[in-house]
Amino acid sequence: MEWNKVIRYLAYTLELLVLFMLQETPGLLPPLFGARPVLLFPAVITIAMFETEIPALAFGVVGGLFCDFGLSGTLGFHALVLGVLCFFISLLVRVYLQSNIATALLTGIVGIGLTVCLQWFFLYFFRYSHPSYAFTHHYLPKYLYTLLFLPLVYFLNRGLSQALRPQEESRL
């Protein structure tokens, strides 16, 4: 295995760990409309844009497990959703799309929206009363607040990917 790839994967892992600690530290990120952002969602989506399918799947599963530990839901739910989502985002970017900020925003809007809607549907809708109130007052603000961090995380991961990729591979 190439050393650049090992260092890049370690950097992504460290990034996920730091973002997990930032999102779980009470009072560090102020809540907006009672919602706190999930920084791992944009991180794994943007990592998937710069990696091939299998590493994207792996980082989606790792980020999802961190979310499962922090968001207190069914263990494995976010790992499954984010793993599959990152696999398909990586495949789409490799085959049909270019990796740029517009694509990152589009995939982030759709991917994070899909993840939040699945989270609401499977973890809230059948278990509690007033699901529409919960969606509009908790899940929708969390979705919008999380989207604010997408450009910052995209440029961080683009810089990591370009700096830690071999020269002949980065020209492709």
Q: Where is each model-derived feature located?
A:
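Terminal, non-globular segments
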Residues: 1-172
